[in-house]
């Protein structure tokens, strides 16, 4: 069946996982307290902090309590929506201040452009917020993407999440190709009927999915 849409992960597939682990997350941890103190009443941030309180049983969080909670979530590797919203805004400030530059593999932008020109619809699916995804993909041309999915549609290891995405795209599952460096995520996508390709930038890869060394090596059926 002809591929009509590509759904790609970012971390490890379009950009190095080390950019998130070694640059973005430490920056968010370092600036979290000051950001909350300065922006707790801003549109979007106030609502995110209120939602964080609701997740903890409906408590109204003081700024230091909110910081402690979000720091704990980051240490635990959790990604609740309030945390993702605030991280995205902190990273936006970092990008704008020149604290870091988005890292994207060099094959990504040309491949995205070629797929777009071929009439293939492009989407992302990441644990990060839409803002964070747009910022990370900025150098590759985030405007080529029609949409940015995050965990509001479901967790990336769950088959139902991919079924929900296919439904939202109004496409047969088999016409959507999922690109990821995470085989467990691809297993969930495959179980939902989507086509898959493992982006194995450091080599390796099992036999459950077609393997490509980079975006330029992906075979579009």
From Swiss-Prot:
Q: In which pathway is this protein known to take part?
A: Amino-acid biosynthesis; L-methionine biosynthesis via salvage pathway; L-methionine from S-methyl-5-thio-alpha-D-ribose 1-phosphate: step 3/6; Amino-acid biosynthesis; L-methionine biosynthesis via salvage pathway; L-methionine from S-methyl-5-thio-alpha-D-ribose 1-phosphate: step 4/6
List the SUPFAM superfamilies: HAD-like
User: In this UniProt entry, which cysteines form S-S bonds?
Assistant: none
Q: How is the cofactor bound?
A: Binds 1 Mg(2+) ion per subunit.
Tell me the GO BP annotations in alphabetical order: L-methionine salvage from methylthioadenosine
GO MF? 2,3-diketo-5-methylthiopentyl-1-phosphate enolase activity; 2-hydroxy-3-keto-5-methylthiopentenyl-1-phosphate phosphatase activity; acireductone synthase activity; magnesium ion binding
Q: What InterPro entries would the database entry show?
A: Enolase-ppase_E1 (IPR023943), HAD-like_sf (IPR036412), HAD_sf (IPR023214)
Keywords assigned by UniProt, alphabetized: Amino-acid biosynthesis, Hydrolase, Magnesium, Metal-binding, Methionine biosynthesis
Q: How does it assemble?
A: Monomer.
Name assigned to this protein: Enolase-phosphatase E1
Q: Which organism is it from?
A: Xanthobacter autotrophicus (strain ATCC BAA-1158 / Py2)
